[in-house]
UniProtKB/Swiss-Prot annotation:
Residues 280-291 have a biased composition (Polar residues). The zinc-finger domain is required for terminal uridylyltransferase activity. Together with the RRM domain, binds the 5'-area of U6 snRNA. Phosphorylated by CK1 in the proline-rich (Pro-rich) region. Residues 56-128 form the RRM domain. Changing residue 218 to A: Abolishes adenylyltransferase activity. Adenylyltransferase activity is specifically phosphatidylinositol 4,5-bisphosphate (PtdIns(4,5)P2). Coiled coil: none annotated. Residues 113-146, 252-334, 638-662, 705-761 are annotated as: Disordered. This is Speckle targeted PIP5K1A-regulated poly(A) polymerase. It comes from Homo sapiens.
Amino acid sequence: MAAVDSDVESLPRGGFRCCLCHVTTANRPSLDAHLGGRKHRHLVELRAARKAQGLRSVFVSGFPRDVDSAQLSEYFLAFGPVASVVMDKDKGVFAIVEMGDVGAREAVLSQSQHSLGGHRLRVRPREQKEFQSPASKSPKGAAPDSHQLAKALAEAADVGAQMIKLVGLRELSEAERQLRSLVVALMQEVFTEFFPGCVVHPFGSSINSFDVHGCDLDLFLDLGDLEEPQPVPKAPESPSLDSALASPLDPQALACTPASPPDSQPPASPQDSEALDFETPSSSLAPQTPDSALASETLASPQSLPPASPLLEDREEGDLGKASELAETPKEEKAEGAAMLELVGSILRGCVPGVYRVQTVPSARRPVVKFCHRPSGLHGDVSLSNRLALHNSRFLSLCSELDGRVRPLVYTLRCWAQGRGLSGSGPLLSNYALTLLVIYFLQTRDPPVLPTVSQLTQKAGEGEQVEVDGWDCSFPRDASRLEPSINVEPLSSLLAQFFSCVSCWDLRGSLLSLREGQALPVAGGLPSNLWEGLRLGPLNLQDPFDLSHNVAANVTSRVAGRLQNCCRAAANYCRSLQYQRRSSRGRDWGLLPLLQPSSPSSLLSATPIPLPLAPFTQLTAALVQVFREALGCHIEQATKRTRSEGGGTGESSQGGTSKRLKVDGQKNCCEEGKEEQQGCAGDGGEDRVEEMVIEVGEMVQDWAMQSPGQPGDLPLTTGKHGAPGEEGQPSHAALAERGPKGHEAAQEWSQGEAGKGASLPSSASWRCALWHRVWQGRRRARRRLQQQTKEGAGGGAGTRAGWLATEAQVTQELKGLSGGEERPETEPLLSFVASVSPADRMLTVTPLQDPQGLFPDLHHFLQVFLPQAIRHLK
C-alpha cells in the first residue's frame, strides 16, 4: 500500500495523478479503478521485475574486445547460475551480467579479484536507476506533459498567443534539427561510396515545417539516372572503430543535444559506460528512443520486429502513389526493386555506425527500409521512389512561409485531432491529410489566406517547372516573390471558422481540391484530368499534385461523421466567453478545454449511430416509441427559444444545483454556389440565434471540448432551414450514396416534403433517463418470454404493435430482475441526450449523468438495437 501511495499525488484543484502511469483522475473512485486496472498493475509488476533484475546484476569491464557473451557466461557460472549477459556491442568495453539469484551475485562481489584471458576484470554492483515508465513513451508527435502544457498556455495573453506558444512547445529545437542534419550527412557519405552521384533528401516532417519532437526521419535516396548498380562487396556485419571515427557525426555534438541518450559519446570510464542501462530516461518533449541501447540489441533481427503494414506508410507524404502501381509493375522490375531494397538494407546494417533494427518492407505501397539510429535516438526509413513526396513536403513548407498563421493553426488542429481520437493510422486521418484540410480551408477564406495550387503553378519561374510521374509539381520555391495575403483575421477567429466550416461541408458529396481551391461536386462529374483513378469515400480530399490520389480514402464513414460532430462541438465552444477571454476564476480557458484528451464516453458521444432511411417525422416518432415504450426511458422533448447573440452565459438564474444547458443553433453553414467554396456564411453576422434549452439537474460529462468535471454548454445543434445539402437538410448525394433505397428516399423527400412546399423540420432532441440496466441480458430475457408465451418470432411479435409489446415486456422483466420500482423522484441510473438531424439521419447520444460509467455499454447496445427497432416500426 505504501508503494501505491508513493505513486499517487493529490492535485491542488482536486483529483489525483498517478506518477507511474502519468494518468490524472477526477476523484477517488476513478483512482481506485485505475489502480486496479491492467495497465497500472502491469507497470507495477514491470517495475518490481526491473528492480529484482538490478539486484541480481553486476557491471563488468576490462575484458578484451574479442571476448563474447558466451565466454563471460562460462566464467561467471563458477559463482552460480547466469540468467543473461548483455554486451555493449558498439564499443565492446563493458557488459552487464545478470545472475540467477541474489546469492550468486553476492558470491561474485565477495571475490576481490577477477581475471579472464590474462586480463583483470573490474566487477561491481549494477547501479540502481529510477524506473522509467514505458507509459511515458507516448505516440509520435504527442503533446508535452499536460501540466507543463496547461501552465504554459494559461499564462498566454489570448488564444492567438496560446497557439503560437503551442508551436514552440511541440516543434524541434535548433539542436534537434542540427542533429538530423548530421545524420543525413552521415547517410550521404556512406551511400556515396556505393552509388556515386546519389543524393539523400530528407522529406516529411523534418523539412515541411510541421515537425514535432520524436517525429521520424524520412529519407529519399535519389539515385538519379544511375543504371543498375555494380556488384558491391558484402557489407560488414558491424561498423569498425575506424569507420565510426571517420564518420562526420561528431559524438560531442550529439552529446550536447537534449535528444541524445547517454550512449551518444564514447565512455571515458567504466562509470560513464554504466549509464547505458536497460532503461533510458525519456521525455515527451524529446524523440522517443528504445528502452535502452543494450536491451534493444536483442531486438535487432527483422524477425523480432512487428510486421509492417502498408497503412503505416500512409501517415505522411510518403503514401502518394497510385493504388495500382504495384499490381502493374512487371515481375522483373519488382524483383530488381526488392534486390535494390535489400542492398540498401545491407549497407545500413553493416556500414552506418549506430544503425540497428534494420528491416526492409518491400510489400508496402512505397517500399522502404526502416531503421533506428542509436546515437541520435531517431527512427526513420529510406525509400527509393518517392520523389513526389519530396515536392509535397516543399509545398507545405512554402505554405507555412507564405503566412505566419499557417503553422499555429496546423499545430493546434493536429493536437486537437489527436486528443479527439481523429488522427492516427488505420481508418483515421493522417497528419498529412489533416494538414491539407487546413490548407484547403485557408484557400477558401474571403479574402484567401493562401493561393491555390493552380495559381502557384502559373507563378513558377525558370528552373521551377517540374514534372514527376506525369504530374505537374511546379510552384515557386521562394515565398518572398509572392504577394502576401490581405486577409488579417486573427488566429482565434480562423480556428473557430475552421470548426464551423468543416462541420457543415458535404464531405462525401464533393471533392475538396487544393489545386482549384474549391469543392468539386461528385454527383455532377469531374473533368477527366481531375477525376480519373481517384477513389472516392466518405471524405474526399485531393492531393495537390497527384490528382488521382484521395489522401483521405482510408477514412471510414464513422470517422468522417465523428470529425464533423467534434467540429460542431468545438465550434459551439468557440462562441463562448470561456474560449474568448481569460477566466478570472482560474478555470481552463481558450485552447485548454479544446486540447484536453477525450474520455471514452465523449468519443462515443461524437460517434453517430446510422439509422435506416425514412421520412424524418416517421423516424423521430419511431425513436420516441423505442426509447419510451420499448426501453422504458423517462423522456422529455427539448424546447427551443430565441435569444440575442450576446445574452446570457448559460448559467441558471435560479438557486440550487439546477443548470440550464444551452444549445446554440448552427449558424455558420456553407452557402450554395460560389460562397460555399469561399467559406461559411454568417460568421458573427446574426444578432439572434436559436438555442435549445434543457432544464436538468446534472452536468454535461466531459464532452469533446471540455475538460473532465467542468460544466459547460451542451454542444448540440438544431437544424435550420436552408438549401439542399446544407445543415438541416439531406443532400441528394448523401442519400444516393446509400444505394437504390437512397435514391428512393431522395425522391420521397423531394415529392413528399419539398414538393409540398413544407418547411424543413429542425433537429429533434430528447433528454432521456434510465433507472435500470435494460440493455443487459435482453436477448436471454426475450428468449425466455417467447418460450413462455409460445409466440416466438412468427406470432404477434412480427407486427409493429406486437414487436413493441414484446420489447416492453422484456424491459419490465429486466426491471423486476434488477429489483425495486421506478421512482421518478429519485436520481436515475443514467441520463443522456439523443439528437437526430434530417441532414444525415444519424443519431448522436450524449451522456448527461453517468456516475457508474455505464454509457459505453449503453452506446454499444444502441448501435445494434436502434437500427433494428426502426426497421420493425417503419
